Amino acid sequence: WIFLQLFKHGLAYKASMPVNWCTSCKCVLANEEVVEGVCERCGSAVIRREKSQWMLAITKYADRLIDDLDNVDYISRVKIQQRNWIGRSVGAQVFFDIAGSERKLEIFTTRPDTIYGVTFMVIAPEHEWVEELTTAENREAVEAYIAETKRRSERERIADTKRVSGVKTGSYAINPFSGREIPIYISDYVLAGYGTGAIMAVPAHDSRDYAFARHFGLDIVPVVEGGNIEVESYDAKEGKMIKSDFLSG
């Protein structure tokens, strides 16, 4: 009954999504069932593949779910777990033109104030535009990287913050505020199911973007005063805006 109500209100829908697939059991595995790229039950290789499945559009009613936790008689610990699981992100959608194309790459960011510090973009290996954005000279490297990524679960990708990997698509985006042309990369630290599956990278003010920029020799432009970007990113939101045109000061 509950599922039917969700379906009637457009909150239950079918979509093709990347899943963990055991090559031996021939079934979908939860992230917790994948250990170092293999199935915890049979030890066979686990790959990432697309599969059509029913989804619940939790983000469409996340605010109500979170707010109404105040009206239920749950213990505090459970309410905290629910709030963390549902999540609430406040930010902005930004569209970046693709150089030489009519397309615009959409991202969601909780730090639109750092837009002038964007020096590259990253899309998830499963992003629907991977093939379109990959140039001929980069195709072989991209295909090899995608194949490698399919052997890792999302849980491993999220947890492994020290490992830095990625590959150039060969395409470029245009920063809508600075007008700067910036490269588009593919990396497994971006997840297709989170936000739009693409990010604007601000290495001066995000630790994972910082590690990526250092690894690939990309520009790091601070736009919030504070910290020492020669050593690490300055992730704090407090500070004077710099190098940001009308936002500076």
What is the predicted function of each stretch?
Residues 47-102, 106-108:
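Long, charge-rich boundary regions
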Residues 1-8, 84:
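N-terminal Rossmann-like or analogous alpha/beta NTP/dinucleotide-binding catalytic cores
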